[in-house]
Amino acid sequence: MRQPPISLVHGMHINLSGKTALVTGSTQGIGLAIARGLASSGARVAINGRSEASVQRAMDTLTAAVDGADLIAVPADVTTDDGVATLQAQLPTVDILVNNLGIFEAVPALEIDDEQWRRFFEVNVLSAARLTRIYLPGMTERSWGRILNIASDSAVATPVEMIHYGMSKTALLAVSRGFAKAAAGSGVTVNSVIAGPTHTEGVEDFVYQLVDKDVPWEQAQRQFMVEHRPQSLLQRLIEPEEIANMVVYLSSPLASATTGGALRVDGGYVDAILP
């Protein structure tokens, strides 16, 4: 199998022109920031969400933010067989797959029921494995591809208030490593990005589950970090664009020797030299 030429660094310019990227759950938060970063780097980006309305809002946001953005609207629920079939029909070929879709919630450990355990596995793990199974063969045939799975610090430092979420993100690390081995020598890389506590609408809601809802946001954020994430070296929530920067780099030809890894963008939250 012929390997593509290795890219050399010239001012760290990332050019993804000619590449098609799919970012699941890309209508808000980290997914939207990743989609913006990829589009800004020249990729054709498929915007995915469960509803046409949410996808269209994201499309409008990105069109206004990125000059000449090349976007595809792909409303589909990728946790269902029908949704995946719809997505695959609209997007038969993908060069960059970012499995960003995920759910989380705070529930006391002994109150997590069987259905919640199943739901977190199906949404956070199985959807990523399913899409990888669909798109990885085409990438290996073309001798180029990038698969990124958005994990979490909860994968390696499980919070007691959401162990079902931590379980799903730990499983996602194993899925990433396993598929990286399956793609060995093909020119396709598979990596996880371990995101630390990140400032999104969903996280704001989560913070206010643990902090008095009457407390202003800036104070609530600081209180949350001190009381619930004191080991963070950054001592603030990470912005979605900071996660996106790592994903864009890993999606590029510059990251050709990085595969099978779990790369941390966690603000030093995980107290370890290695993941």
Residue ranges and their predicted role:
Residues 20, 27-28:
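Conserved glycine-rich cofactor-binding loop
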Residues 152:
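Residue(s) in the substrate-gating loop at a strand-loop-helix junction
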Residues 108-109, 113-121, 147, 228:
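Substrate-binding pocket helix/loop in short-chain dehydrogenase/reductase
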Residues 137, 181-182:
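Alpha-helical segment proximal to the catalytic Tyr-Lys
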Residues 2-15, 157, 247-248, 259-275:
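Short C-terminal tail/terminal secondary-structure segment
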Residues 129, 136, 144, 189, ...:
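C-terminal substrate-recognition "lid" of short-chain dehydrogenase/reductases
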